[in-house]
């Protein structure tokens, strides 16, 4: 799977709140996702793309979905990165904060700084910028999902959507919001 954007250790993106729980893996049936995942992992030579500190890899590769989120409410799949579990955590500071609190985020920030080759203050700034972008994007309630990176190459059968396949798909995490707002009694 060729990269549309260069790999960047510095670019951390948090998932907007309305899209929590959403992923290509969660939208596809297992057979479709496994094809995409396996291609991403084997195209990297079954190695972690991040290749951070020696001895930090546990040998298990995970497929990290790289999405871009724009102000118009379009979420676009850009790339799938094979990452070891330890490196994968570096790109999910929101999850770490939710599960381990500020102490966990502080530990993650130190690891991120070492792996990215930056000072701790710079790592904190990058995570803060990601949290700021997250708060803005989380205000958008309707999202259009663009999986065109993989859908022309792999048949993606939808699991959660009421579509036979995925490509461009509107996602409304609150499907009854329009009915409630349109109700004459509201």
Question: What are these regions, as identified by a protein language model?
Answer:
Residues 85:
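Conserved N-terminal glycine/acidic-rich loop preference
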Residues 38-44:
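Sequence/structural segment immediately N-terminal to covalent heme-attachment motifs in c-type
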């Amino acid at each position: 799977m060729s990269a549309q954007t260069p790999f960047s250790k510095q670019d951390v993106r948090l998932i907007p709140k309305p899209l929590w729980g959403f992923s290509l893996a969660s939208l596809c049936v297992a057979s479709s996702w496994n094809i995409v995942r396996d291609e991403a992992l084997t195209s990297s030579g079954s190695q972690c793309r991040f290749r951070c500190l020696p001895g930090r890899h546990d040998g298990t590769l995970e497929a990290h979905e790289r999405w871009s989120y724009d102000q118009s409410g379009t979420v676009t799949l850009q790339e799938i990165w094979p990452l070891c579990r330890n490196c994968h955590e570096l790109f999910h500071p929101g999850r770490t904060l939710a599960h381990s609190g500020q102490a966990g985020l502080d530990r993650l920030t130190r690891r991120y700084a070492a792996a990215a080759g930056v000072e701790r203050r710079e790592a904190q700034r990058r995570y803060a910028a990601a949290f700021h972008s997250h708060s803005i994007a989380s205000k958008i309630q309707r999202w259009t999902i663009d999986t065109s990176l993989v859908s022309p190459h792999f048949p993606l059968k939808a699991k959660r959507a009421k579509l036979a396949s995925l490509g461009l798909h509107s996602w409304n995490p609150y499907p009854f919001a329009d009915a409630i707002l349109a109700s004459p009694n509201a």
